[in-house]
Amino acid sequence: MLMMLMMIIGITGGSGAGKTTLTQNIKEIFGEDVSVICQDNYYKDRSHYTPEERANLIWDHPDAFDNDLLISDIKRLKNNEIVQAPVFDFVLGNRSKTEIETIYPSKVILVEGILVFENQELRDLMDIRIFVDTDADERILRRMVRDVQEQGDSVDCIMSRYLSMVKPMHEKFIEPTRKYADIIVHGNYRQNVVTNILSQKIKNHLENALESDETYYMVNSK
C-alpha cells in the first residue's frame, strides 16, 4: 500500500459533447493512476418497468440518476475502499443483472456524466470541474452515430427523442451547470494540446496539495 493524495475531477457536458473522449485521453496519460466512474451506470433501477415504459422515460433528467449511490461510491473510494459499481445496459434500458464494474481507489478519480454538476453534494466532492462545450449540431450528429451503432436505434427515433427530451433537458438542466466549471473545454479542441494542458494542471494541483499538507489517503495498488 502506498500513501497517495486523491484528486477527484468532474467532467460534464451535453450528450455527444466529447466527455468520454476527453476522459479517455486523460486516462491514457496517467494510466493506472486514474480510475473512472461513469454517471451513465448510475441510472436508477427500472426492472419494475415494462420495456415500453422504459422506452418512454426521460433519461436526461436529474431524477433519472441514483445520485445517492454515486455519491456513496465516490466517498467509499476516498476512504480507500474498492467499489463494485453497477453497469447499465442501454439496449435493455436497465441495469445489467450479470455485470458489475470494479473500481479501485487511485490518485485521480474521473467522474464523468451529463449531470454530475447538477447535484451540489456530488459537485462539492470534486477538486476540479471541467465542462465540455460542443455545438448542438455536432452533438446531435455524434449522438446519432453512436445510438445507431450501439443501440440499433433508427434515425427517426433518435431525432424524435432529441427534440422532445434531450434538447429541452439540456437547456434546462445541463447547460446551466457550466457556471460551476473551473475549466471550459470547447468540443472541437486539439486533443494533444488540451489534454497536455489539463494533465499539467492535474499534476500541479497534486503537487500544490502535497505542499499544503492536505489530507492523504491510503490507496490500494491495482
Curated annotation (Swiss-Prot):
Keywords attached to this entry: ATP-binding, Cytoplasm, Kinase, Nucleotide-binding, Transferase
Cellular component per GO, a single term: cytoplasm
Reaction(s) this enzyme catalyzes, per UniProt: uridine + ATP = UMP + ADP + H(+); cytidine + ATP = CMP + ADP + H(+)
Coiled coil: none
Domain of life assignment: Bacteria
Binding site for ATP: G13, G14, S15, G16, A17, G18, K19, T20
EC numbers on record: 2.7.1.48
CDD domains associated with the record: UMPK
Entry annotated with the keyword Cell membrane: no
Keyword Cell wall biogenesis/degradation: no
GO terms of biological process kind: CTP salvage; UMP salvage
Family per record: Belongs to the uridine kinase family.
Classification via HAMAP family: Uridine_kinase (MF_00551)
Protein name: Uridine kinase
